[in-house]
Amino acid sequence: EVSAKLDGLPVKYRIETLNWKEFNYKPEVSFAIAYGEKEIFLKYYVRENFMKAEKTETNQMVCEDSCVEFFVSPEADGIYYNLEFNPIGTCLLGTGTSRADSRRADPEVISRIRRLSSSGSMPFTERTGDLEWTLTLAIPLEVFFHHDIKDLKGKTFRANFYKCGDNLTVPHYVTWNPVGTINPDYHQPEYFGTLRFV
């Protein structure tokens, strides 16, 4: 039901910014986002030439697979959350103020994120071709456990959305909002864009 409603939204946002010239492969990636009383709803739409989902355990390095990511900072305290998913919905959730002090969340907290994958739940090695997949997420506000968020209406968060694949045949790093670092690094809250819940 959530997936179908996100499909019906009039606006999809593209993850299409290439920030690092040595990584010039760009898959087709977009997302739809909405919110409810206690959840953020997010759906990624991906079309790429290389696809992998080998990680099956919570908090494994899913960025080494085909990976979609949502980094979000709910308040101006410098703390952000990085939610990273492979095509079968395996999730890494970290939180901190930088890459250096980021800590993994408790798997019990992560288990509250509802996930629906078009790729099923079984792991697979790299596939090649003209490959399409989607991932729908329902992220409860309690996942943002450093912050006491009661509701979203009227709130403004800072965020960025990413697609990567560190260990694919052709690695790639694509962003929604531009990132101005010399090398690929998504842990850059100063380059987050604005996310308004109207």
Kindly give the residue locations of the regions a language model identified.
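Structural preference for beta-rich elements and adjacent junctions enriched in aromatics
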Residues: E1-V198
